[in-house]
């Protein structure tokens, strides 16, 4: 029975995301209390740039892995890992040379170093997610636990320091990289015949890379624009907490997105997608109601009175979080199914709308204007993805909205299955 449960990819993704959410939330509490609003605003600003830079530097390699995996290419795993290693090594050399030649700003140097590490972490994580979900779930668990323990210790033992907080972020990524590297078959890693695949991978990854960049811009452009309008770091810190809490509502959609990514490496499991959308949408609705009932006092209790206003930001952003489940799950299907152009165009329009609305709303409404811009963008993107999915795959809208009675039977039975479709 235990072996059957551990072979079920829904269960593994569920357990992995549960611990990510649990340890991550504890880390978030202590990180915000450790830094306070001003340092947290500066910390979030730096990491937002890291996220965007790393999205560019990844070049979409891990995003096209399921597509190449479906082609039954011999040593596909080794080909992608070797390319990722070469890529990161080149970035490190270029960054070092530039740092030596030019008098690089400290923040710029930090962004470069952390971005290169983040690129390798992301490549390894998503490639291994397709290859071995069980091992990937274990590694994510270890990473989340280490990050949580180190953050709590920093809060208890150290004075507030931005450099320490950034170091914790780097250590988290280094832990996950070291765990992934233990699996690699090094003697079989670099072969001359792999080179012929590198250019096709980079070519096919270019559009997904642009799409990944648009994703990050859509998530992170608000904080960058708050910076550009000289909103003080304390307000940005308040906003960043509200954004982080709203992103926790995406944990359930991410569970199903991971499973969809794994299964679309073999086929297009429409019923799996429908089931995933129903469960995710129901969860978001319940979470919104529960959080609304708990009210602002919960934020004061957990994060301190200086972060009380983050509750308002969270509730606004949750309105957009519902529609983003359609992007997260359906978007993964589109990428794996070769619909990258449609995926890209939708995200591009969403990002442009986000930027325009931010320009109009931030000068008057500050962080509330940024949250409204995000909600409009999220809803627009999600609705278009849903409409195209219903059209392309001939799915009735009733099949994706809310859980059905039959879903509870499936949920009850899935722990008894190995890897059957739900």
Predicted regions and their residues:
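Hydrophobic alpha-helical transmembrane segments
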Residues: 112-114, 139-186, 349-353, 367-391
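Helix-loop junctions and terminal segments of transmembrane helices
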Residues: 24, 28-29, 57-73, 242-270, ...
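Interhelical loop/hinge segments that connect adjacent transmembrane helices in multipass membrane
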Residues: 1-2, 6, 109, 134-139, ...
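Signature of the first transmembrane helix
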Residues: 4-59, 148, 203-228, 233, ...
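Transmembrane helix-bundle signature of multi-pass secondary active exporters and lipid flippases
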Residues: 47-55, 239-258, 287, 317-324
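Membrane-water interface segments that mark the loop-to-transmembrane alpha-helix transition
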Residues: 9-20, 45-46, 50-106, 267-288
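Membrane-interface junctions at transmembrane-helix termini in multi-pass inner-membrane proteins
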Residues: 7, 66-73, 118-142, 265-266, ...
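Interfacial segments at transmembrane-helix termini and the short loops linking adjacent helices
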Residues: 37-40, 98-114, 233, 293-328, ...
């Amino acid at each position: 029975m235990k072996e059957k449960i551990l072979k079920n990819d829904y269960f593994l993704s569920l357990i992995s995301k549960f611990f990510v959410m649990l340890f991550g939330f504890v880390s978030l509490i202590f990180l915000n209390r450790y830094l306070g609003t001003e340092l947290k605003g500066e910390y979030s600003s730096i990491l937002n740039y890291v996220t965007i830079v790393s999205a560019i530097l990844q070049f979409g390699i891990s995003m096209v892995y399921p597509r190449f995996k479906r082609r039954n290419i011999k040593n596909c795993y080794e080909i992608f890992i070797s390319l990722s290693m070469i890529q990161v090594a080149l970035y490190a050399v270029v960054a070092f040379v530039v740092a030596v030649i030019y008098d690089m700003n400290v923040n710029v140097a930090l962004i470069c170093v952390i971005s290169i590490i983040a690129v390798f972490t992301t490549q390894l994580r998503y490639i291994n997610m397709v290859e071995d979900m069980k091992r990937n779930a274990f590694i994510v668990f270890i990473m989340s636990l280490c990050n949580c323990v180190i953050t709590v210790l920093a809060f208890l033992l150290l004075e507030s320091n931005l450099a320490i907080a950034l170091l914790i972020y780097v250590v988290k990524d280094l832990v996950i990289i070291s765990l992934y590297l233990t699996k690699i078959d090094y003697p079989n890693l670099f072969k001359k015949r792999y080179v012929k695949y590198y250019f096709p991978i980079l070519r096919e990854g270019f559009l997904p890379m642009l799409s990944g960049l648009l994703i990050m811009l859509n998530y992170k452009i608000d904080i960058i624009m708050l910076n550009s309008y000289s909103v003080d770091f304390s307000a940005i810190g308040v906003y960043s907490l509200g954004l982080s809490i709203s992103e926790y509502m995406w944990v359930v959609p991410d569970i199903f997105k991971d499973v969809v990514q794994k299964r679309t490496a073999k086929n297009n499991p429409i019923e799996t997608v429908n089931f995933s959308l129903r469960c995710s949408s129901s969860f978001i609705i319940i979470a919104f109601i529960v959080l609304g009932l708990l009210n602002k006092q919960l934020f004061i209790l957990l994060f301190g009175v200086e972060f009380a206003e983050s509750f308002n930001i969270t509730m606004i952003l949750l309105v957009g979080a519902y529609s983003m489940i359609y992007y997260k799950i359906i978007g993964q299907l589109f990428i794996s199914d070769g619909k990258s152009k449609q995926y890209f165009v939708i995200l591009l329009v969403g990002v442009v709308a986000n930027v325009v609305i931010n320009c109009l709303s931030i000068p008057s409404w500050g962080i509330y204007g940024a949250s409204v811009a995000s909600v409009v963008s999220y809803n627009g993107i999600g609705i278009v993805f849903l409409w195209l999915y219903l059209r392309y795959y001939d799915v009735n809208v009733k099949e994706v909205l809310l859980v059905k009675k039959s879903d509870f039977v499936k949920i009850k039975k899935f722990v008894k299955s190995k890897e059957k479709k739900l």
